[in-house]
């Protein structure tokens, strides 16, 4: 009984994956790839602002910029991107997905903890979360005013 259920679930997942890969606009993958490459390149360049053992300003800038732009694009979707969903995916999933980095943020927090930089850790975590939410909200409001 469990094998039959598992087999049915796997077939269903495979069907959905096949549908996504082959029956959806395949150009969106190209646009996401290009957006991802550009976002990764910008993320790499911004990372030079980080210093060894210092405050990770590059990661903070990348993540806060990404939060603002994601909010802005979310609000602008109805007005500007409804006819261009592929472009929206290229920017959000590709560019912003590659630009922002939650995993690096977490690793930097662990590094600060290991080096007993508790004040810096607290400042970085609170700044990232509070300003990330705030900038995303500002982006949504600004985008709503533009649309």
Curated annotation (Swiss-Prot):
It is found in: Cell membrane. GO terms for molecular function: fluoride channel activity; metal ion binding. The chain crosses the membrane at residues 29-49, 61-81, 90-110, 118-138. It is a multi-pass membrane protein. It catalyses: fluoride(in) = fluoride(out). GO terms for cellular component: plasma membrane. Na(+) binds at residues 97, 100. Keywords: Cell membrane, Ion channel, Ion transport, Membrane, Metal-binding, Sodium, Transmembrane, Transmembrane helix, Transport. The keyword Transmembrane applies. It holds the Pfam family CRCB. Belongs to the fluoride channel Fluc/FEX (TC 1.A.43) family. Fluoride-specific ion channel. Important for reducing fluoride concentration in the cell, thus reducing its toxicity. This is Fluoride-specific ion channel FluC 1. It comes from Staphylococcus aureus (strain Mu50 / ATCC 700699).
